[in-house]
């Protein structure tokens, strides 16, 4: 499935129906009064969060979304039918902005949550509305109001409590695959993961916690280099970051510093987000090398650093215990 996490759409609410000018015409009522009905309300355009959707792909080619117009009024003071609302399903985690002003209209995070993004126009008045003591036979009526029309930007930010970050080939996809039932593409070269992978990891209580493997973080990612700028937004909602370091890389210390710099540059409070530091690929180093590297990383972080092997599953139970503790479970 192609992963689309941004889309621009045009929405147009329905216009209100026109009121009409009509008079009561009955056999024994020679001076029937005004009886023109009001127009119906235009339909709204509504977005609704749906947890069965994972991408904004449906909006890639669906550019204009409109709602029904209200119907014109009828005789005998009959109000025209209101236009039907158009309800669009979007993934949970979709943020909606006005394209021209960048103002956030809403953030659809919960299943079934709705947001009206374009209001339908009000129906016009029929001439029955203008009856007065001074005018017993008004002919005046009004047209319906035009429905709202906007260009919107939809931006999907994944709803995961734990975000797994690190340079390409640090072992993020392998880790999420052994902790959960997720089956991401895994290979021994950088940029295997081109879309965020989600996996549900079971807590001791049996409840699930969503983990996200965030791809594409390289030096300059926060400035749009590589894939990182597109995916950094997906860790904005996370509660805990799992910072994975490839202990067998050419320069693990520099790798650690690179990710730190990108989190700082991107902003949005990511650098101050609770973080658990993890040295992965223990199986590729001897005990002396691991201990030496561990000491260096702990001096930089001033925190405990976990040593794991996602391949052999060494240290995963201890790592999970730390994650549950940080999340308050």
Swiss-Prot record:
PROSITE patterns xref list: G_OBG, OBG
Alphabetized HAMAP family for the sequence: GTPase_Obg
Protein name: GTPase Obg
Family named by the database record: Belongs to the TRAFAC class OBG-HflX-like GTPase superfamily. OBG GTPase family.
Reported cofactor(s): Mg(2+)
Annotated Gene Ontology cellular component terms: cytoplasm
Enzyme Commission number, as recorded: 3.6.5.-
The Obg domain, residue ranges: 1-159
Record-linked Pfam families: GTP1_OBG, MMR_HSR1
GO BP of this protein: ribosome biogenesis
Function: An essential GTPase which binds GTP, GDP and possibly (p)ppGpp with moderate affinity, with high nucleotide exchange rates and a fairly low GTP hydrolysis rate. Plays a role in control of the cell cycle, stress response, ribosome biogenesis and in those bacteria that undergo differentiation, in morphogenesis control.
Record keywords, A-Z: ATP-binding, Cytoplasm, GTP-binding, Hydrolase, Magnesium, Metal-binding, Nucleotide-binding
Species of provenance: Prochlorococcus marinus (strain NATL1A)
Quaternary structure note: Monomer.
